[in-house]
Structures are given as C-alpha cells and as structure tokens.
C-alpha cells in the first residue's frame, strides 16, 4: 500500500523525531512511503487569521502536490482537519471544489489510518511507564477521531494508560490564539498541567504537535519531569 506523507510544519521544524517515527512505523506495517518534497503549509494559520486569499493559494498548491496520491497520511489531527475543510473553503468554485474533495476523501490522521484502513490495533509497541493522553480539540471535535488513539495505546506492552481529568478541555494552544491571548492561554495550560500531575504520569502523549509544544514548553519552564511524546513515537517504541 502506497502512502504519501504530509509531514506538517511543526514536525518539519520542531518534531522531526515524530516524523521519523511515523515513517518507520508505517513501513513496518507494510506501507510504501512517498514524501512529496513540494509540500508546504496546509494554509491553516493564514486562514484562521483571516488571510483567506493567501491561504487559498497554499491550499491549491497542496491539492496539486498530492493530486496523484493514493492515501495522504499526516501525524496531526489539526492539519488533517484542515485538509478535510478544503471542499468547504472552495465551495462553489467549479475548478477547485471537486479537486479539494478528492484530496479530503483520501486524507487520514495517522492513528485513524492505522485503525480504520490498515485494520490494526496492536502494532507491537513496547514502552514501560505510566501515561496519560491529551485529547486535542481539532482531532476530536472537528475531525471526529476519538477512539483510534486509545485502541492503539491500550495494546502498548508495559504502558499503563490512565484517564486524564477533564480530558476534552483545551490546552490553551489553539494556533494563533496562544499568541493573541497569551495570558488566557497560559492559565489554560497551567490547568491542563495540574490535571496531568493529578494522575502521576511519567508520560504525556498526544497526536498534535501544537498541543505538545504548548504543554511541553510549560512543563519545561516549570521544571516538571514529565516526558512529552507524540503518539507516533510511542507506537514506534521497541
């Protein structure tokens, strides 16, 4: 099965290990990985900031870049959501709406792809410790992927997965929200960290790098020993 990887900006710039883990994991599960080097940002930051015209140019470029892909898989619920939104953005545009839908229909978040397409829930991962999972807003509320990460994590050998209190509460990142509303964002992430500490977790696992960067950065500034891991890294652990 041939899979085209959409790496995302944050993985390219800050979380390269999560990108490598994604490739290694999918290859081990029998996928042939294609990485279109022309890929860029999906346009979400510009679109959410009101720069619709500029965002559409980025979206058109992405549509062209992945036009011939069989499957597009991304280790980001947020960016997968944005690609799924393309048909709505181009609604009424005769040239681009159908092309946008074609891309949206073959786009999957990583855990969604493994569970729903590859039909696997145990990938042979091993990681010792106690962990909790941060449920990101875009991935659950907009993309609708809720159970897939848990189905995979519960089969990681040696990992004790404990529920996170107020799991569906935002971590305060929200893309440009964390920049524009810094004080509120800080209060939100502090509350999230309190909940993580309540369960005495060794690891905080998530599927969106924006959330992990926000929570992980705050943990580091506070000198907390909790390790933050992208779910791809966990599933690739041996």
Curated annotation (Swiss-Prot):
One of its GO terms (cellular component) is cytosol. Is involved in L-lactate degradation and allows cells to grow with lactate as the sole carbon source. This is Lactate utilization protein A. GO terms for molecular function: oxidoreductase activity. PANTHER family: LACTATE UTILIZATION PROTEIN A (PTHR30296:SF0), UNCHARACTERIZED PROTEIN YKGE (PTHR30296). GO terms for biological process: lactate metabolic process. The lineage of its organism: Bacteria, Bacillati, Bacillota, Bacilli, Bacillales. Belongs to the LutA/YkgE family. InterPro entries: Cys_rich_dom, LutA. It comes from the Bacteria.
